[in-house]
Amino acid sequence: MTLSSSQSSPPSSQNLKRKQQTISSFFTKRAPTAEKRSNDLEDGRATTQKGAEMPLRETTGDQDDLVDDEDGDIVVRAPKRVKTNRVDPENGFGRNVTRGPDPPSSSSQRTNLCKFASSPADDAGIEKADDPEARQRQLEREKLHKLFVKKLGGADCLIGIGRNATTEAPSGTEEVAEGDEDDESAPPPRSKGKGASKKGGSKLTPLEKQVIEIKRKHMDTVLVIEVGYKFRFFGEDARIAAKELSIVCIPGKMRFDEHPSEAHLDRFASASIPVHRLHVHVKRLVSAGYKVGVVRQLETAALKAVGDNRNAPFSRKLTNLYTKGTYVDDVEGLDGATPAASGGASPATGYMLCITETNAKGWGNDEKVHVGIVAVQPNTGDIIYDDFEDGFMRSEVEARLLHIAPCELVIVGELSKATEKLVQHLSGSKLNTFGDKVRVDRVAKKKTAVAESHSHVANFYAAKLKAANTADDAPASNLLQKVLNLPEQVTVCLSAMIEHLTEYGLEHIFELTKYFQHFSSRSHMLLNANTLVSLEIYQNQTDHSAKGSLFWTLDRTQTRFGQRLLRKWVGRPLLDKERLEERVNAVEELKSPDRTVQVERLKILLGRIKSDLEKNLIRIYYGKCTRPELLTVLQTLQTIAQEYVDVKTPEDSGFTSPILGEAIARVPSILEDVVKFLNKINMHAARNDDKYEFFRESEETEGISEHKCGIASVEHELEEHRSVAAGILKWPKVTYVTSSGIEYLIEVENTAAAIKRVPASWVKVSGTKKLSRFHTPEVIQLLRQRDQHKEALAAACDQAFAALLAEIATNYQSFRDSVQSLATLDCLLSLAAIASQPGYVKPEYTDQTCIHVEQGRHPMVEQLLLDSYVPNDIDLDSDRTRALLVTGPNMGGKSSYVRQIALIAIMAQIGSYVPARSAKLGMLDAVFTRMGAFDNMLAGESTFMVELSETADILKQATPRSLVILDELGRGTSTHDGVAIAQAVLDYMVRTIRSLTLFITHYQHLSNMAQSFPNHELRNVHMRFTESGSGKDEEITFLYEVGEGVAHRSYGLNVARLANLPAPLLEVARQKSSELEERIRRRRLAGLRADVGGLMEDPAKGDEDFFQRLISNAEQL
């Protein structure tokens, strides 16, 4: 073959001729003669004739060439690129070559150089074809040509490059092929004259115009767009999807603003996912922190074909929006429901928290801010609100964020710098729900925000009450009044959350005003942020997982909703003595051997609940429940209610505890409603998610019945048509067949006699070598009618199902109350399982502020240790000893001892048994801790600054009914300053605040303070140990027992030895320590000698304080 032009004569310029010669010399060893070119021409013509005899290969998946005509039939547009089978003249096998439309009359120089034909002018002087040398040279040229074509990727690839503005690129063809039959596109662009090309590439398809229109309204959203049987991403969304979902992104334009940098690109970048995997991928995108929108087609192909807009693209609309907090379309949610008992992460709360604040007063360390919060859990329907003042440390805000653990934040207005830094720190830390960055949305706050918010909330609830016809109902009016009386900052947050959730279609949750809860209710013990972390309430401090936390220790629940309720109990211990006694008495009854039968019955019942009923019910309330899920929920509720159908009153439950009796009696009250709904459902169809047979025949709506009759009528006509078809073919009878999913086909043998009888109007659908399959025009028309009825039936079934969900939603509160009763029973059974362990005792409650525990143990360490835990006593009373100064060697167990005391107090006020021989406790209103050393670089605060700031916060909030734990206060500065601060704080705690206090220190000088309290309000205790050996052979044995008195040494060198510091270093440290101790001993001895000498000179100095100081100095020697 020879490279020349077949469409136009070669240019006459000498430069172009040189270029042609240069390229020809690249492909051939020497220039061919005219005779050889003639041989090439004949071979080329032969090849072309062979190729023309080959059938065209059909393109698959390219639906851009299909459009709907006015009758709804599919017609074919002009092809963009057609693949043909060409036969290689050398080896005889076909190869795929992409052929474009006929090129324009004028071609570029580069294009002309790469076309394969001959010019009539070259016919003269042709060499004979049988010349062996010519034939050899021809084979070599063709071999080089094949290598060249293989390198470029196609025989006419340079033609495509030369006509980039008028010809679809191969990647574009692949992209369209990846789509489905509903991927509407514009006709292939025609050849454009000079200046006719549009900036930004080829003309946008109708689908792309639709995508841009929707995207411009939702620029902050990753859009997943339904296109036929796939969901597709476009532009920047495709890049994000490819990154997060590990799918292929077809290159193209990323931006939606026709940016000049992308003018050379013809199409948007795209990626696709199958329809049935939509929610799997949406969950992954939402979990990664993205806001995801699902755009669906609002019409089907069959209904569109008979509609007024059959020639327009499919109508599409944004139907769903999802973020972390609003994803309720899957009952599993985003947390994967890893049980905490297995040592996984703490269960996700799924709260969305709205926060706003105003500057109340002060500046710097005296700054006070007024904060309002509203936290909503769309998965369960819970709503928490609070209004409070907070200091410059923002400890109150931090405590609420750690308690609620939101997965999404909505910030109204501007936050102060301190609050903003705290939010940023916690939202990016592992302390949040999902262990990754929390999504943050911001809402502007107007100057008239309070008035506008109050009006918005009032109108919202007034409209809801009017729609429910309960405006004159006294309970409904009281609930409305309760909402309207919320504090101003809470109302601002509530209004913002209503508006925010309206965008996601979840505003109905605020109609459930029964589930509004105040966070700071004084009916619960206050556990601030430091306490939650230091005492490891929800997460351990090692790897931040649930294993090793108090919640992990107490969690023996069998249901998801029971686990969530127990988490609330753990974080909010009770202050009401009567409620506590009721709860702990219920636990005692459940562990009693006399109630074994009833308890086993309860355990079996709860063990049969496999679904998360609380989340299922809220999904029904939102109208997002699936048919199999609805059947499971109703059958589970029926099973639960029937288990206790004979229980009419709490006394019939078999338990004497009021909590247990009332919870069990509430369960069967829903049985009548559940059975009523189940009687409407066809169980088998619901289990198989068959929407068409979901309702029993007597419960079907008029629309469903009408379209079912229409389908039956069409199918009857199809059967009647068999006789007509048999008469045309002159057969006794005709039998329909189904092939590849296509129904009502008539098979005719491929014989001349049989085919002759087939009318020309019959459409051949498929066939084999022996037979052909046809559709008659009547069958095509009837099938089209049947498809229309089927799609209308599907819409009617969906509408009826939505109406059923709305009817069930009217019973939401009664169903939810029954599920809450089950959750309470589950939590009590969990606490009973803990109480049944050896060494646990029922706590005794008193109105006094005291902690009297005999042989108490650390609840978590005891379960994690292989060896037995050493128990210890504690005796604190506000009227006697209310503070302990704890000293002892490093690693002696001081911190574990004080944590143990706090944890026992918290467990007791949860209503749990405690690990001790006996326990008598008063009602503590809070537990405050100041433990550990860390700085706050975000706020520019040093370790010592953080330490003192937290201490100041405790001094402001602590009451005589609080338990305060201070660990090594004052160690972040010099010894003299540290001792002074520690002594002043301890004295203030004991004398002024009068809290129960546990003070850990290595400052032995503080032990002298106990002598200034004659009634033993402060007492010295230490962690016991034994010494053996001396010098470098000295060894310390920790006994982990609490003894009276003071430990005068901390034995830090022993810890250094256990840490495997180098022996030479330890020897130097021991020598320096001995020298320092000797120097201090001599100073004290000199001071003691001086005091004794002064006393002998002037006996009048010997008052009581003098002799106490003298005795203390002598003891320290």
Curated annotation (Swiss-Prot):
Residues covered by region (Disordered): 1-135, 165-203
Ranges of biased composition (kind: Basic residues): 191-201
Biased composition (Low complexity): 1-14
Top-level taxon in the UniProt lineage: Eukaryota
GO biological process: mismatch repair; mitotic recombination
GO cellular component, one term: nucleus
InterPro entries according to UniProt: DNA_mismatch_repair_MutS-lik_N, DNA_mismatch_repair_MutS/MSH, DNA_mismatch_repair_MutS_C, DNA_mismatch_repair_MutS_core, DNA_mismatch_repair_MutS_N, DNA_mismatch_repair_MutS_sf, DNA_mmatch_repair_MutS_con_dom, MutS
Biased composition (Acidic residues): 61-73, 175-185
Basic and acidic residues bias spans: 32-45, 125-135
Residues making up the signal peptide according to the UniProt record: none
Pfam family, one: MutS_II
GO MF, any single term: mismatched DNA binding
Subcellular location: Nucleus
Keywords attached to this entry: ATP-binding, DNA damage, DNA repair, DNA-binding, Nucleotide-binding, Nucleus
Positions bound to ATP: G888, P889, N890, M891, G892, G893, K894, S895
Region (Mispair-binding domain): 198-325
Family stated for the protein in its record: Belongs to the DNA mismatch repair MutS family. MSH3 subfamily.
Subunit structure: Heterodimer consisting of msh2-msh3 (MutS beta). Forms a ternary complex with MutL alpha (mlh1-pms1).
Record's function text: Component of the post-replicative DNA mismatch repair system (MMR). Heterodimerizes with msh2 to form MutS beta, which binds to DNA mismatches thereby initiating DNA repair. Msh3 provides substrate-binding and substrate specificity to the complex. When bound, the MutS beta heterodimer bends the DNA helix and shields approximately 20 base pairs. Acts mainly to repair insertion-deletion loops (IDLs) from 2 to 13 nucleotides in size, but can also repair base-base and single insertion-deletion mismatches that occur during replication.
Protein name: DNA mismatch repair protein msh3
Species name: Neosartorya fischeri (strain ATCC 1020 / DSM 3700 / CBS 544.65 / FGSC A1164 / JCM 1740 / NRRL 181 / WB 181)
